Regions:
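A cross-kingdom marker for long, charged
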Residues: 36, 223-309
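Sec-exported extracytoplasmic/periplasmic mature domains
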Residues: 58-66, 158-162, 274, 278
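Sec/Tat signal peptide C-region and signal peptidase I cleavage site
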Residues: 23-28
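Acidic/His-rich structured neighborhood in mature extracellular/periplasmic domains
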Residues: 91-204
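Start-of-domain marker
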Residues: 29-96, 107-109
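Sec-dependent N-terminal signal peptides
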Residues: 12-21
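Flexible, glycine-rich surface segments
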Residues: 165-258
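N-terminal secretory signal peptides that target proteins for export/translocation
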Residues: 1-9
Length: 309
């Protein structure tokens, strides 16, 4: 999937404005999700329920229009949701799972695709009966499974928009936060504050916190000003990445040291960041970036050491 930067943003903004004004019909799906349900840990159960779940979720996510924005088919956001079923109760239709959620973003004028988001949800639990018709009401969240899928749909779309325009995903991300607020009565872990500092509540609450505005700005400065610029001028692109890390990433960690967002971000950016600086840039630049990344995520030091090479 390739997106031609300014033209893509122009279409997004035009479509968004037109939709607000009611001047044009807005029908376009935003996501191109690959959903996998791994049930290898479950023995003695007819696999058809898991196949049906996978097919139903894929259809639900990809065929639903989540926003009023228009995306061409080749501009849809690529994402992967890999669900591992650890327990399944056929009598109650309860699935106990964990899920790895990953979203990707094409880099302008390049065949390279970068990771926009990647994290493991260890509380991806829900009820599902085979052949169940999935329904979702944003204002009345009463189904755990569709709430989970909607949460990640809005999170991914919002972060993608943030990467093309400063705070560009504000409205969509607010809808993600609304799902969390409306899901408080669901009897499932992951929606409430203080349960975990990296659960669904923590991720979107921290991301939308005013004190984390530098982290949101990072999405634009790193991807649009940094990676997208590399195809035409590698030195300028890397310099912009350096500025984004030295200002946005560093400040967000200093302003909210208890937030895990910077650490999660550096987890899935580890290899990309080391490749950007390995054998490139001045020693001072390399050392500055190393110090920032090590202070945020010392567990990835093997990758950070490559930056200094």
């Amino acid at each position: 999937m390739r997106i031609h930067g300014e033209a893509f943003m122009a279409r997004l903004l035009l479509a968004f404005t037109a939709c607000l004004c009611g001047t044009t019909p807005c029908q376009a799906q935003e996501l191109n999700a690959k959903i996998m349900v791994n049930h290898s840990q479950i023995q003695g159960t007819d696999a058809s329920v898991f196949d049906d779940l996978q097919q139903n979720l894929t259809q639900f996510v990809n065929e639903r229009q989540w926003t009023n924005l228009q995306f061409a088919k080749n501009e849809r956001i690529g994402c992967n949701i890999n669900i591992t079923v650890t327990k399944y109760d056929k009598g109650t239709n309860v699935f106990t799972c964990k899920a790895v959620v990953q979203a990707n973003r094409p880099v302008y004028n390049s065949a390279y695709t970068t990771t926009l988001y990647s994290n493991t949800d260890n509380d991806f639990n829900f009820e599902y009966a085979q052949f169940e018709q999935l329904q979702f009401n944003e204002e009345q969240v009463d189904n755990q499974l569709t709430a989970l899928m909607a949460y990640y749909a809005y999170l991914i779309i919002g972060m993608n928009l943030d990467s093309f325009a400063p705070m560009g995903g504000e409205d969509v991300l607010q809808r993600c936060l609304n799902i969390v607020n409306n899901a408080q009565n669901l009897n499932y872990t992951g929606w409430k504050a203080f349960d975990s500092n990296r659960n669904r509540f923590a991720i979107i609450n921290d991301y939308m916190d005013g004190a984390m505005k530098p982290f949101r700005q990072l999405q634009y400065d790193y991807y649009r000003n940094g990676l997208d610029a590399m195809s035409t001028n590698a030195e300028r692109g890397r310099a912009n990445v350096t500025t984004a890390l030295e200002t946005d990433l560093k400040q967000s960690h200093e302003d909210r040291p208890l937030s895990l967002l910077p650490q999660i971000w550096t987890d899935y950016k580890r290899d990309e960041l080391s490749s950007i600086y390995k054998g490139k840039g001045t020693q001072k630049e390399k050392q500055n970036i190393y110090d920032i990344l090590f202070s945020i995520n010392a567990s990835q030091n093997m990758a950070w050491e490559k930056i200094k090479e």
